[in-house]
Amino acid sequence: MASALEQFVNSVRQLSAQGQMTQLCELINKSGELLAKNLSHLDTVLGALDVQEHSLGVLAVLFVKFSMPSIPDFETLFSQVQLFISTCNGEHIRYATDTFAGLCHQLTNALVERKQPLRGISILRQAIDKMQMNTNQLTSIHADLCQLCLLAKCFKPALPYLDVDMMDICKENGAYDAKHFLCYYYYGGMIYTGLKNFERALYFYEQAITTPAMAVSHIMLESYKKYILVSLILLGKVQQLPKYTSQIVGRFIKPLSNAYHELAQVYSTNKPSELRNLVNKHSETFTRDNNMGLVKQCLSSLYKKNIQRLTKTFLTLSLQDMASRVQLSGPQEAEKYVLHMIEDGEIFASINQKDGMVCFHDNPEKYNNPAMLHNIDQEMLKCIELDERLKAMDQEITVNPQFVQKSMGSQEDDSGTKPSSYS
């Protein structure tokens, strides 16, 4: 090894042994150029460092190896990164979260390029667990994990990181970017959409759309299109966005989504034939946006919505009559819809196979069983937890020096007095 590299290894060992992590972070930030100039010796450097004891030094070397324009031996580097993430010291890498997250981004990009997303899923799950201070903390690696799960069509590994409500963001030494936040909620919404958990999907798309913004984001635009479609499938109408939504949405994003607004407008007429005509008219747009599958589900949900409307008018109805009223092709298709809706708990009915009559029933749920009481208890606990969280956040803001300074300034402006100077 060159003398400069030997000095780097010795410094990493010494600072790690002394527990001087801040100084070690400064060293690895300055050593990028040195390591890049000595690519052929980097595996020797890795051999001289212990992953557990010298995690930050190993991280610096792997980051530089992955930063090179071309990777000569990807399989070796992949194995090195896999071993590092599974065995590194979590307390150490939290001093260099920006570099650690950067390494995960590089790994993700390399696997996406090679069309091997499945290989990175378990590695990124380990990386998130190492980096998080708590399970409610969002990191930029969350977006990478969701991206790989989507590309691999393997959604379930991401669910433990989506089902929790995020209360905090890992700043990553200033490297956390709004793009990571938007991608987490956009990809998360797509995963929930794929699993037909439309309620949670709608919430995730809403988070992406309502992110404070001063410019148009393509991620926000795509989230908005899916938000409209999922709203129609879940609620039968487009759910109104919160008042705090950025003006960017109304001014720029809505005009770029005209086909989707037309779809929502025609959907509200409850006429499937007109909706089919509009889908055919804008099929190129929907296909280009990769939303044709959701659009077809909108059409299917309109049939279901119209069947639900019949339950408020009729006690019994023949399948033939239902098919003509709802504009289905015939009694067989009507029966298929009714059976699926009964199975999903969307209507309460029974079909008499002898005469093809559908009998609609009242909701059998009396809301007095132990399971329902347990659900109510769980919802109450969530409300209590939310109240405690809000109180803690309020207290945190109250003692924040910037908030106190602004509050004092506004009070002085209101009273017309000038701030006093103390010596």
From Swiss-Prot:
At the top level, the lineage of the source is Eukaryota
- Function, in words: Component of the COP9 signalosome complex (CSN), a complex involved in various cellular and developmental processes. The CSN complex is an essential regulator of the ubiquitin (Ubl) conjugation pathway by mediating the deneddylation of the cullin subunits of E3 ligase complexes, leading to modify the Ubl ligase activity.
Family named by the database record: Belongs to the CSN3 family.
Record keywords, A-Z = Cytoplasm, Nucleus, Signalosome
PANTHER family listed in its UniProt record: 26S PROTEASOME NON-ATPASE REGULATORY SUBUNIT 3/COP9 SIGNALOSOME COMPLEX SUBUNIT 3, COP9 SIGNALOSOME COMPLEX SUBUNIT 3
Q: What protein name applies here?
A: COP9 signalosome complex subunit 3
Q: Name one Pfam family in it.
A: CSN3-like_C
Which cell locations does it reside in?
A: Cytoplasm; Nucleus
Gene Ontology cellular component terms for the protein in this record? COP9 signalosome; cytosol; nucleoplasm; perinuclear region of cytoplasm
Q: Per the UniProt entry, what is one GO biological process?
A: protein deneddylation
Give the start-end ranges of region Disordered. Answer: 402-423
Spell out the InterPro entries in the cross-references.
COP9_N, CSN3, CSN3_C, PCI_dom, WH_DNA-bd_sf
- The PCI domain sits at 197-365
**SMART domains (UniProt xref):** PINT (SM00088)
Q: Which PROSITE patterns match?
A: PCI (PS50250)
Q: How does it assemble?
A: Component of the CSN complex, probably composed of COPS1, COPS2, COPS3, COPS4, COPS5, COPS6, COPS7, COPS8 and COPS9.
Q: Does the keyword Cytoplasm apply?
A: yes
- Per the annotation, which location comes first and is thus the protein's main one? cytoplasm
